[in-house]
Amino acid sequence: RFKKIRRLGALPGLTSKRPRSGIDLKNQLRSGKRSQYRIRLEEKQKLRFHYGLTERQLLKYVHIAGKAKGSTGQVLLQLLEMRLDNILFRLGMASTIPGARQLVNHRHILVNGRIVDIPSYRCKPRDIITTKDKERSKVLIQNYIASSPHAELPNHLIIDPLQYKGLVNQIIDSKWIGLKIN
């Protein structure tokens, strides 16, 4: 993980750690003119590592975004941000996106009253995301909410920390996307 962060820059969904501000000797030796291919490859890798996608999953999202109306890049980021694992991360119910994926895979999360165990589930506006009624599920979410720094919540999400409940208001606005993509 840390090699990826040093190479690509901060990836908030992968880990809360940040790259060192000092310039490493390796990076000084490798610095120079970056080709268009390298820039595109690094941006693609940022998306893959931040959202925890395989190459095939990312290609499917690019294909869907290409067919949709509007800017392909913006539509792609909206599709990725509306995934269930990412919404749990944005709500503060998990410290990282891989942690949110684990919560979903272990069946701790309900969407509109039904268990969803697919991290790539595409949330829609007016979806209600809650935890299972089991004590173990609530304790897990409670620990994440208590330990996470209360960052500003995106305006397309609402959270009720006492009931461990989140609501998707609308499709995300492009200014709230946390990852800077070139």
Swiss-Prot record:
Recorded hits in InterPro entries, A to Z, give: Ribosomal_uS4 (IPR022801), Ribosomal_uS4_bac-type (IPR005709), Ribosomal_uS4_CS (IPR018079), Ribosomal_uS4_N (IPR001912), S4_RNA-bd (IPR002942), S4_RNA-bd_sf (IPR036986)
> Where does this protein reside within or beyond the cell?
Plastid, Chloroplast
- S4 RNA-binding domain: residues covered: 82-143
Reply yes or no: does the keyword Chloroplast apply: yes
- Cross-referenced PROSITE patterns, in alphabetical order? RIBOSOMAL_S4, S4
GO BP field = ribosomal small subunit biogenesis; translation
Molecular function GO terms recorded = rRNA binding; structural constituent of ribosome
Gene this protein is translated from: rps4
Name the predominant localization. plastid
Q: Which Gene3D superfamilies match?
A: Ribosomal Protein S4 Delta 41, Chain A, domain 1, RNA-binding S4 domain
Q: Outline what the protein does.
A: One of the primary rRNA binding proteins, it binds directly to 16S rRNA where it nucleates assembly of the body of the 30S subunit. With S5 and S12 plays an important role in translational accuracy.
Native organism is Alophia veracruzana
- Enumerate the UniProt keywords alphabetically: Chloroplast, Plastid, Ribonucleoprotein, Ribosomal protein, RNA-binding, rRNA-binding
**Record lineage:** Eukaryota, Viridiplantae, Streptophyta, Embryophyta, Tracheophyta
Subunit structure and binding partners: Part of the 30S ribosomal subunit. Contacts protein S5. The interaction surface between S4 and S5 is involved in control of translational fidelity.
Question: What domain of life does the native source organism fall in?
Answer: Eukaryota
Q: What is this protein called?
A: Small ribosomal subunit protein uS4c
Family to which this protein belongs:
Belongs to the universal ribosomal protein uS4 family.
